């Protein structure tokens, strides 16, 4: 069983979604998890304990394990991610330029089959639609929406 498959099976078995997995050259294993209600410190501890056990049993070599939430600027990797975050502001970088540019920022539209839509501003006030597939994407991330105004 490959490392990604092993970790995904463990994480989903605990009721979480594996968002991303990174392995650094220094032996650090970074696991990013999520669930609709968000991730707490207790969730990270629970997954860490289980993964440490599984990685030891499977004799997987690593120096350090880090489990965390994907953060406010969560990466979008699966079609289900694009479905879940439809209506959100995102940044998408394509593998190949389209209309002379690779990076687009706009409002995500729900996928239609394999096609994902992004409404962006081409020029001041001129809205345009970009259609692409997962295969076209180099990287895609949510753009954090933070409100610093005080609540009354």
Swiss-Prot record:
It is found in: Cytoplasm. GO terms for biological process: ribosomal small subunit assembly; translation. Keywords: Cytoplasm, Ribosome biogenesis. Its main location: cytoplasm. The keyword Cytoplasm applies. One of its GO terms (cellular component) is cytosol. Pfam families: DUF150_C (PF17384), RimP_N (PF02576). InterPro entries: Ribosome_maturation_RimP, RimP_C, RimP_C_sf, RimP_N, RimP_N_sf. The keyword Cytoplasm applies. Belongs to the RimP family. Required for maturation of 30S ribosomal subunits. This is Ribosome maturation factor RimP. It comes from Burkholderia multivorans (strain ATCC 17616 / 249). The lineage of its organism: Bacteria, Pseudomonadati, Pseudomonadota, Betaproteobacteria, Burkholderiales.
